[in-house]
Amino acid sequence: RVLCDGRNYSDDHVALLRVQANDTHPRVRLDALRACSWVNTAAAAEVALEVVKHERDYYIDYALEEAIRGMEPLWKSAISSGKPFAANNPAGVEYILGSIPTADLANLPKSTPVLLAMLTRPAVKAQARQDALVGLAEFKKTDEMTELLSAIDYVDKTDAPGAATVIYDLVLMLTRREPGELAESRARFEAWTKSAKRAITRRIGYVALIAADESVDPAWKLATRSLDSLK
């Protein structure tokens, strides 16, 4: 509260608020959020997002939503400029991108968080999803298959509305990969059959195993060991 009231008299108030936004006590983090909304700069929006790294309650969620809404022109301008924003806070970037409509998201400068959001959101056109996959592999200097499998893992673990539909879309992309890529990813498919969160992902794991092995026998043998994995 002192930092908030004295924000016009301190040159390092944002840095000090960053410390408070990461405090172990939720009340301190809540007061830091309130102060950020009064500072009203892109840097303050970055600090407000620091609370996403920690456990949140109703009051922190409410304060965060209000603070981010009030500073929307500032953080949108920062993101649209292509300059680094909350670069060391992927959870915070994910939170803030969640408030941007898909149509607007497609117009933002390409970055790993933006491309991941395009790849894993519902109601994204097939070509836009494919373009996001290609871009993500380029940004991360990996390959499309690696990023596609990681995206399926990511969506499987979320509780976001439409996640099952997204998994279907991603699996459709998986069916277009080369047989050799499927064979090389066999261990990942088997892991899905055993430990995926969603039943649909576990079942897809079996289908992918059959495609990778070009035979139903190994998948059938694995399935009969545990009927629970088929549920």
PLM regions with names:
Residues 1-231:
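Long, ordered, helix-rich scaffold segments
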